[in-house]
Amino acid sequence: MVDHARAARMAKRIQQIVATAIERQIKDPRLEFVTITDARVTGDLHDATVFYTVRGKTVDAEPDTATAEAALAKATGQLRKIVGDQLSVRFTPTLSFSLDTVPEASAHFEELLARAKAQDEALRAQSAGARPAGDEDPYKP
């Protein structure tokens, strides 16, 4: 029987543990701009997927996701040990890391909304002085 509430609680705790460990315990400078955004645990509590994003060194800089991915792959064993020490479960889930695409998708969605708003404004400006075709009130006797 799968306990989804327990899996959700464990995922939340794994997210907190991994984020804290990357910030305070893992001494890899390649992980400096990595942010843990979410974690998901399978129903059998044996596998956990940790989602992360990578920032650039500056606002305009492109993030180096390949370097961050390599650093996370190297630190996976150490992170699993830290998670196992802090979780009180019989079996420590295996950790896998996946780049979180939600920020890029939301930025694209925001761009689409801005484009639609601009088109609405252009249409509103175009129709401001427009008059209906035909009679003003076609139902007038």
Swiss-Prot record:
It is found in: Cytoplasm. InterPro entries: KH_dom-like_a/b (IPR015946), RbfA (IPR000238), RbfA_dom_sf (IPR023799), Ribosome-bd_factorA_CS (IPR020053). One of its GO terms (biological process) is maturation of SSU-rRNA. The keyword DNA damage does not apply. Residues 120-141 are annotated as: Disordered. GO terms for cellular component: cytosol. PROSITE patterns: RBFA. Its main location: cytoplasm. One of its GO terms (molecular function) is ribosomal small subunit binding. Pfam families: RBFA. Keywords: Cytoplasm, Ribosome biogenesis. One of several proteins that assist in the late maturation steps of the functional core of the 30S ribosomal subunit. Associates with free 30S ribosomal subunits (but not with 30S subunits that are part of 70S ribosomes or polysomes). Required for efficient processing of 16S rRNA. May interact with the 5'-terminal helix region of 16S rRNA. Monomer. Binds 30S ribosomal subunits, but not 50S ribosomal subunits or 70S ribosomes. Belongs to the RbfA family. This is Ribosome-binding factor A. The gene is rbfA.
